[in-house]
UniProtKB/Swiss-Prot annotation:
Residues 477-496 have a biased composition (Gly residues). The keyword Disulfide bond applies. Residues 86-105 have a biased composition (Low complexity). It comes from the Eukaryota. GO terms for biological process: cell differentiation. The keyword Coiled coil does not apply. Glycans are attached at residues 147, 360, 395, 557. It holds the Pfam family TGF_beta. SUPFAM superfamilies: Cystine-knot cytokines (SSF57501). Residues 116-139 have a biased composition (Basic and acidic residues). This is Protein decapentaplegic. Keywords: Developmental protein, Differentiation, Disulfide bond, Glycoprotein, Growth factor, Secreted, Signal. Residues 24-474 form a propeptide. The gene is dpp.
């Protein structure tokens, strides 16, 4: 009977009715009663016991009433969509000062007919699952019993709304409730206004936090690529850029135009290939060619010349004496000759001679002369100037190298007096002519051209073009090293600060922005020079780029002046600029190519690649 009276009292009031989605749960009845309770004062122990007993009896009566015929079944089984629309309409009507408070429930009734009772019960059970985290938070808050119950009622009602509508109405509902000054407010609205903790929770819940907000971002390492990857993935420059690159390289190579040659008709001597490999730092097992030009440490160019056949050669019919002629006009006049050597290849002796024990023990003497004056038949003998002599054995030496620098110097000074060289082979015991052909000047009839190219006599001229600069004190002493950590592969301690054990540079989080060496690969095929440049096909020039932060660490390979400049810039940026990231040490690149006269040239170009970077 008390339950019927309670429901009639609710219908008689002019305030909005808080709708309950289901009456089969006794906790919902308790929330319903607590929501419409007119008082908020803390009840005494006796009052609390009486209220609990009354609530239990009321809940039992309400449950029994819901199972029987009830004219308010449609109202009690309204869907969550109608509840959300009802609340939204109530808020809008209140902001517009609309006193028609019964319009919302009437509209909700029409919308509620679209949903079945089974769907409403299923959705109601899914929404009202126990929330352990909310109950634990509510226990820690020192609030009144009524406020706790009302807060749960508000949350249950808000959970009826779909997720998208709930996110859209979070902020408008909060603003409307906080700014509303009307006197007609339901108990739920009053609780919503007076509970700041609930409003704070709604604002926090409305913030969208990315899923990876707490993830740790690992430090990215600088990208490194192999030379094959750089060649494969590099961008082709436009034609105008190619012309500029070609002009710059021609100026660097001291050429007016690229040589036009037929590469198929030229064979690179094996001696030049070995010399190139040795200069590039490769270890070779059998290299017994003296290189006097390299001992000067200033020759940066090596040229090879082959023997030019002439009718004069017929005047030397004997196998132990022969004439060699080399055309050295292709050597520029501005280059200074540092050394010159003659390389002779000895043919294998006959099997009978090799098998002879005495022949294996026999030593031979090779002599080379500069023909300073030709002879006239019947009038005068030719004049010779002994240049060098070498002693060789049959079973030990395959090549013979002789120093002929005085003769080449005379040829460069007076080209018209280049009469060639005279080579003579004798035995050491009797100083008689050697009985076997040790050196050949012409290709045999049954010998391939390529085989003869590797065996023919060669003249090597070592010159210096004077374009390279003298090494500084820092480079010679090793203090100008490769830039340490700033140079990526540089050698030496760097910065002139020689230390026995230099500590490893500190790793920066954004180390790509600091001064360091970057890759810059130059491919000769891009400018169409791969037809006359034998080796290498390209090279990595590198470049320096990055910031010089304050304070300058040791691995930045900085000078004392750069340290002072950085300090002054940090104190007064407008007075002096920051230190710049520049190359601190450069290295040379050896190139093997062909010139216009089809001469094989091995040139060591100075300051072509960056070894270390630093702040200067």
């Amino acid at each position: 009977m008390r339950a019927w009276i309670l429901l009639l009292a609710v219908l008689a009031t002019s305030q909005p009715i808080v709708q309950v989605a289901s009456t089969e749960d006794t906790s919902i009845s308790q929330r319903f009663i607590a929501a419409i309770a007119p008082t908020r004062t803390e009840p005494s122990a006796a009052s609390a016991a009486a209220a609990a007993a009354t609530a239990t009896a009321t809940a039992t009566a309400t449950t029994a009433l819901a199972k029987a015929f009830n004219p308010f079944n449609e109202l009690l089984y309204k869907s969550s969509d109608s509840d959300s629309d009802n609340n939204n309409n109530n808020y809008k009507n209140r902001n517009n000062n609309n006193n028609n408070l019964n319009k919302g429930p009437r509209n909700n009734k029409n919308k509620g007919n679209k949903h079945s009772k089974s769907d409403a019960n299923r959705q109601f059970n899914e929404v009202h699952k126990p929330r352990t985290d909310q109950l634990e938070n509510s226990k820690n808050k020192p609030k009144q019993l009524v406020n706790k119950t009302n807060k749960m009622a508000v949350k249950d009602q808000k959970h009826h709304q779909p997720q998208q509508q709930q996110q859209q109405h979070h902020k408008p509902a909060t603003t409307t409730a906080l700014t509303s000054t009307e006197s007609h407010q339901s108990p739920i609205e009053t609780i919503f206004v007076d509970d700041p903790a609930l409003a704070l929770e709604e604002e926090v819940a409305s913030i969208n936090v990315p899923a990876n907000a707490g993830a740790i971002i690992e430090e990215q390492e600088p990208s490194t690529y192999s030379k094959k990857e750089l060649i494969k993935d590099k961008l082709k420059p436009d034609p105008s850029t190619l012309v500029e690159i070609e002009n710059s390289l021609l100026s660097l190579f001291n050429m007016k135009r690229p040589p036009k040659i037929d590469r198929s008709k030229i064979i690179i001597p094996e001696a030049m290939k070995k010399l190139y490999a040795e200069i590039m730092g490769h270890e070779l097992d059998s290299v017994n060619i003296p290189r006097p030009g390299l001992l000067t440490k200033s020759a940066n160019t090596v040229r090879s010349f082959t023997h030019k056949d002439s009718k004069i050669d017929d005047r030397f019919p004997h196998h132990h004496r022969f004439r060699l002629h080399f055309d050295v006009k292709s050597i520029p006049a501005e280059e200074k000759l540092k050394a010159a050597e003659l390389q002779l290849t000895r043919d294998a002796l006959a099997q009978a001679a090799v098998a002879s024990t005495s022949a294996n023990r026999t030593r031979y003497q090779v002599l080379v002369y500069d023909i300073t004056r030709v002879g006239v038949r019947g009038q005068r003998e030719p004049s010779y100037l002994l240049l060098d002599t070498k002693t060789v054995r049959l079973n030990s030496t395959d090549t013979v190298s002789l120093d002929v620098q005085p003769a080449v110097d005379r040829w460069l000074a007076t080209p018209q007096k280049n009469y060639g060289l005279l080579v003579e082979v004798r035995t050491m015991r009797s100083l008689k002519p050697a009985p076997h052909h040790h050196v050949r000047l012409r290709r045999s009839a049954d010998e391939a051209h390529e085989q003869w190219q590797h065996k023919q006599p060669l003249l090597f001229a070592y010159t210096d073009d004077g374009r390279h600069k003298a090494r500084s004190i820092r480079d010679v002493s090793g203090g100008g090293g490769g830039g340490g950590g700033a140079g990526e592969g540089g050698k030496g301690n760097g910065g002139g600060r020689n230390r026995r054990h230099q500590r490893r540079p500190a790793r920066r989080k954004n180390h790509e922005e600091t001064c360091r060496r970057h890759s810059l690969y130059v491919d000769f095929a891009d400018v169409g020079w791969d037809d006359w440049i034998v080796a290498p096909p390209g090279y990595d020039a590198y470049y320096c780029h990055g910031k010089c932060p304050f304070p300058l660490a040791d691995h930045f390979n900085s000078t004392n002046h750069a340290v002072v400049q950085t300090l002054v810039n940090n104190l007064n940026p407008g007075k002096v600029p920051k230190a710049c990231c520049v190359p601190t040490q450069l290295d040379s690149v050896a190139m093997l190519y062909l010139n216009d006269q089809s001469t094989v040239v091995l040139k060591n170009y100075q300051e072509m690649t960056v070894v270390g970077c630093g702040c200067r």
